[in-house]
Structure formats: structure tokens, C-alpha cells
């Protein structure tokens, strides 16, 4: 072959194809199209059987190798007459000569997909059945063909079959196209290997005592969107999603509006989690990953939104709204009067959606309920921090387990507000103080480097509404001053984790103020 045959745009005609697939989707149509184009097909096992049953000419791999399938099909294609035809680099005359001397024909196309290992594991199958679904020959063929992409095109997804037939009809794939297919092929086998390695470590070689965090951590993501920029215009950014994950914000359907930005996604994620921290109908309004307002309602989602917005209308301008239930017409009408970047909900009444889409710039998303549990990843210089996701499932998150430190036991309405404020704390960046009344935040102090400033900020935001309200702190009061800031503004009951060396002083300050003070024994820092 001449040097010109290996240029990026040079096509390599397809005369011989090796096909071995577990997923038979589109197989017959592919084989028929290849045959009509004069391509010789070599195939294995059940793949060859399906092709032959349709009257399409096919050479079984055992005829090619002169060696039968053995060991229940574990050994089919692991043979020099197969892999030499895949790995011969035809840019090298000595490789072409070796094939000719051995009487081996090269393959120009490999079509392979792998045993359903992940699906088998997810089905709850036993260890032996899962092990049997670890593909050996398939990945070997895929990797061989992908390595030898100057000479071979490899396809691992039935969605690519139309492209194969188009290439066959028009002289083959270009070198640039074969490179792209090779990259996809190695990504495919990498995903497969990650799944097998993860399962093997957790199932066949677990640590003792058991741990949530394996010694080896492997994951893969797919880029699903290029974003306009990152947190700031000079930063490039993109969105990646985990194809095997529970559908979340990354898989949300956008029904209306401009493209989502990096900051839209971070705020929407915070809002979505915050709204589902509550069993009652809830609306969360978030900006810069902190709540402008969160509220629950036994009346309606519109009532919850109104109360959340009233917490801090100034900050809610340009915020992100999340509801944990269907958005009603009444709520949509209110939202349409406010500049809002994003609204996200599990559903919308048709008329509500029509109202929202009149606003050109609002982004309207529908998403599945967020999955609870799991882990969170945070890159640091030279490594990665992994932790269990902070959920409201600690012993101290149940008010039945709270300790009354001082004051009279809270009446049901006051206790409900304390529980609400405590649950909101999880969604607030530390140091966090939440003041609430009537199932709504009325003052939120967040992101302060000392707790007394967080208390002052919450009181300032709440204004006159603070008197008679309740408050929650995401961590203990290290000194009485933070609590005294709240009681001085008229807060009647407070809940905090406790655990400070000055707990007695804090409790004494609460007793002197005549308020109710509960200890949870749990903490909800967020950084």
C-alpha cells in the first residue's frame, strides 16, 4: 500500500468482517447489508447461528481456526488465526508478508459487544453466574482491533451499525474515523473492566472489617454538555454524567429556557436536595448554594413558595427554585412575577408550564427524586476526598432522641418548627444559624467563620419576625454569645448539637433567658 492510503482522510475498503455480539439488536440488518456490499462475514456461536438462520452467508470461527469452541464457549476466538488477522499492521510490509506466508486474511471490520456483566450483577445473580458473564474473548478482540486502528475499524454499539453500512457503501472508514471508533472501543472496555474490578473487590475480596470505602476506586463519566463557562467567564466548564447512576440533576429534562450554566447546576443541585430534605410539600430557593428561603406547607405548593420567598425577597432575585411536588398554576403565576434563573420540580401542571414558558429566560427543568445515601467526591490537590453523603438520618436527627437541656418541653407547634429549622441546617453552608416560624425560614445566617456572626446575620435578616420564633444551629455554640444574640432578639426555643466544653455555660445562658434548649448530639457541617 502507498503512503497515501494512511492519510487521515484516506478510506480503507471493508472486505472482511468479524462479528461477535451478545446484544443481537440490529444484527440481521447489519449482516444483510454487509453481504449485499460483498463483505465476507466471520462469526461466533449464537451470533453466527442468528445470521445463518436468515440465510445470510457466514463463516463460523471454528472453521477459520480449525479448532472447536471448548469449555462451554469460554474459548472461541482466542486463536492466532483470529488475532493475527486483527493485529497485523498493514502499514508494515513484513506484517503483510507474515499473513500471506501463514495463509491468514486480515479483517477490516470488527463488530463486538460484551456479555452483560453489570446487568447480571444487578439482577442479584449468584457469584458463579456473575463470574461466567465476565467476557474474555470479546474485550480481547475489541482491544486488538482498536490498537490496530490504522488497519481495522471496530464498532461496539448497535447504534453505530447505520454508520458501518454507510461506510461500506462509500469505500470504508477514513483513518480519522477509525481513530474515533478506537477511542470509543477502549472506553467501552474500560467501563467494563471498572465494573468487574469493583464487583470483585467488594464481593470476592472484601476487607475485614467491612468498609464503605474500597482500596481501589474506579468510576467513569460521559460528557453530556459543554457549558458556556464555569463559575466565572474565564473558566471553561462541562457537565459529565454517570450512565449507570440513578437519574439525577445531570439527567434532568430541560423543558424551556436558555442553556444551563455551571452556577445554575450547582445551585439547582443544592435546591433539589434541600427541597427533598422534607416529607411535607416543600419549596427551596437557593442562590450561591445557600438558601434564600425554604418553607413547607400543608396547604399547597404555592403557599410553600410564597413563604420561602418572603424569607428574603431581595436575595431571591435571580435565584433557583426547587419544589418537591408538582408545580401548580398558582405557584407558576407567582414565580412568573419574579426574576428566576431556574425552576426544577418532578412535574408541572400543563397550564403552569404554559405560564412559565412565557418567560423567555427562565430555565424549566423536570427531574427524578434525588437518590438518598451514597458518597460524595471532592478533588483536592493530588487526591480525592470521599465521604458518605450527609443525610438527615443520624440518631440525633430524630427529635425523639433529643435531650432537653433546659426550659419547658416544646409544645407540638414549636417542636415542629424546631425540627424544620434543624433539617434546613443541613442545606446551609457553615457556620449556619436558621431562624424559623410557621414552617418557614425567616432568617438564615450562613457561611460565617464564627457562630456569633452567623447568629447576628440571621437576626438581621429576620428583623421583627424573630420574636417568638425558633432557631437551629448546625454545630454547637462554642460560647454563650451566639445563643444570647438569638435570645436577645426574642427567639423562644433553640436546638443545637451540644458537645462544647462550654455546654454548661450555653445551657445556663438559655436558662437565664427562660427559653427551651434541646441538644441533638448530631452535627451538619457543610463546606
UniProtKB/Swiss-Prot annotation:
Which PROSITE patterns does this UniProt record tie to the protein?
A: MGS (PS51855)
Organism domain of life? Bacteria
PANTHER family for the chain? BIFUNCTIONAL PURINE BIOSYNTHESIS PROTEIN ATIC, BIFUNCTIONAL PURINE BIOSYNTHESIS PROTEIN PURH
Database matches in HAMAP family: PurH (MF_00139)
* Enzyme Commission no: 2.1.2.3, 3.5.4.10
Q: Which Pfam families match?
A: AICARFT_IMPCHas, MGS
The record's GO CC annotations read: cytosol
Reaction(s) catalysed by this chain's protein: (6R)-10-formyltetrahydrofolate + 5-amino-1-(5-phospho-beta-D-ribosyl)imidazole-4-carboxamide = 5-formamido-1-(5-phospho-D-ribosyl)imidazole-4-carboxamide + (6S)-5,6,7,8-tetrahydrofolate; IMP + H2O = 5-formamido-1-(5-phospho-D-ribosyl)imidazole-4-carboxamide
List the pathway annotation: Purine metabolism; IMP biosynthesis via de novo pathway; 5-formamido-1-(5-phospho-D-ribosyl)imidazole-4-carboxamide from 5-amino-1-(5-phospho-D-ribosyl)imidazole-4-carboxamide (10-formyl THF route): step 1/1; Purine metabolism; IMP biosynthesis via de novo pathway; IMP from 5-formamido-1-(5-phospho-D-ribosyl)imidazole-4-carboxamide: step 1/1
> Which InterPro entries does the annotation name?
AICAR_Tfase_dup_dom_sf, Cytidine_deaminase-like, MGS-like_dom, MGS-like_dom_sf, PurH-like
State the protein's name.
Bifunctional purine biosynthesis protein PurH
- Please name the taxonomic classification of the source: Bacteria, Bacillati, Actinomycetota, Actinomycetes, Mycobacteriales
Amino acid at each position: 500500500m502507498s503512503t497515501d492510503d494512511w492519510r487521515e482522510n484516506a478510506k480503507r475498503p471493508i472486505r472482511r468482517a468479524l462479528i461477535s455480539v451478545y446484544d443481537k439488536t440490529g444484527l440481521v440488518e447489519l449482516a444483510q447489508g454487509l453481504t449485499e456490499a460483498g463483505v465476507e462475514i466471520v462469526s461466533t456461536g449464537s451470533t453466527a447461528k442468528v445470521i445463518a438462520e436468515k440465510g445470510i452467508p457466514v463463516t463460523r470461527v471454528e472453521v477459520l481456526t480449525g479448532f472447536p469452541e471448548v469449555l462451554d464457549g469460554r474459548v472461541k476466538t482466542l486463536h492466532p488465526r483470529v488475532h493475527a488477522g486483527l493485529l497485523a499492521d498493514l502499514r508494515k510490509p513484513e506484517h503483510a508478508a507474515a499473513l500471506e506466508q501463514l495463509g491468514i486474511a486480515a479483517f477490516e471490520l470488527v463488530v463486538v459487544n460484551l456479555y452483560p456483566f453489570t446487568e447480571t450483577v444487578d439482577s442479584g445473580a449468584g457469584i458463579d453466574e456473575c463470574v461466567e458473564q465476565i467476557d474474555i474473548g470479546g474485550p480481547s478482540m475489541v482491544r486488538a482491533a482498536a490498537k490496530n486502528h490504522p488497519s481495522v475499524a471496530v464498532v461496539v454499539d448497535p447504534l453505530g451499525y447505520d454508520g458501518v453500512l454507510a461506510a461500506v457503501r462509500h469505500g470504508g472508514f477514513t483513518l480519522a474515523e477509525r481513530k474515533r471508533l478506537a477511542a470509543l472501543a477502549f472506553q467501552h472496555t474500560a467501563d467494563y473492566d471498572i465494573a468487574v474490578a469493583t464487583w470483585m473487590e467488594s464481593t470476592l475480596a472484601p476487607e475485614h472489617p467491612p468498609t464503605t470505602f474500597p482500596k481501589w476506586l474506579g468510576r467513569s463519566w460521559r460528557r453530556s454538555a459543554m457549558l458556556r463557562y464555569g463559575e466565572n467567564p474565564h473558566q471553561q466548564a462541562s457537565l459529565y454524567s454517570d450512565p449507570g447512576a440513578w437519574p439525577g440533576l445531570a439527567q434532568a429534562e430541560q423543558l424551556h429556557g436558555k442553556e444551563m450554566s455551571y452556577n445554575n447546576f450547582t445551585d439547582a443541585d443544592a435546591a433539589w436536595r434541600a427541597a427533598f430534605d422534607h416529607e411535607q410539600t416543600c419549596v427551596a430557593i437557593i442562590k450561591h448554594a445557600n438558601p434564600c428561603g425554604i418553607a413547607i406547607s400543608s396547604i399547597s405548593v404555592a403557599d410553600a413558595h410564597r413563604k420561602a420567598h418572603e424569607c428574603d425577597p431581595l436575595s431571591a432575585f435571580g435565584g433557583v427554585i426547587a419544589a418537591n411536588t408538582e408545580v401548580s398554576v398558582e405557584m407558576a403565576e407567582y414565580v412568573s412575577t419574579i426574576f428566576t434563573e431556574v425552576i426544577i420540580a418532578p412535574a408541572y401542571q400543563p397550564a403552569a408550564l404554559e405560564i412559565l414558558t412565557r418567560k423567555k429566560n427562565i430555565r424549566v427543568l423536570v427531574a427524578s427524586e434525588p437518590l438518598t445515601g451514597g458518597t460524595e467526591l471532592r478533588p483536592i490537590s493530588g487526591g480525592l476526598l470521599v465521604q458518605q453523603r450527609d443525610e438527615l438520618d443520624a440518631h440525633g436527627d430524630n427529635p425523639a432522641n433529643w435531650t432537653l437541656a433546659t426550659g419547658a418541653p416544646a409544645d407540638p407547634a414549636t417542636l415542629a418548627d424546631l425540627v424544620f429549622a434543624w433539617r434546613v441546617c443541613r442545606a446551609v453552608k457553615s457556620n449556619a444559624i436558621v431562624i424559623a416560624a410557621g414552617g418557614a425560614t425567616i432568617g438564615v445566617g450562613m457561611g460565617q467563620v464564627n457562630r456569633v456572626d452567623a447568629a447576628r446575620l440571621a437576626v438581621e435578616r429576620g428583623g421583627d419576625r424573630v420574636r417568638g420564633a425558633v432557631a437551629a444551629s448546625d454545630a454547637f455554640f462554642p460560647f454563650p454569645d451566639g445563643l444570647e444574640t438569638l435570645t436577645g432578639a426574642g427567639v423562644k426555643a433553640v436546638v443545637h448539637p451540644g458537645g462544647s466544653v462550654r455546654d454548661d455555660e450555653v445551657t445556663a445562658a438559655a436558662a437565664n433567658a427562660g427559653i427551651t434548649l434541646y441538644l441533638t448530639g448530631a452535627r451538619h457541617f457543610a463546606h
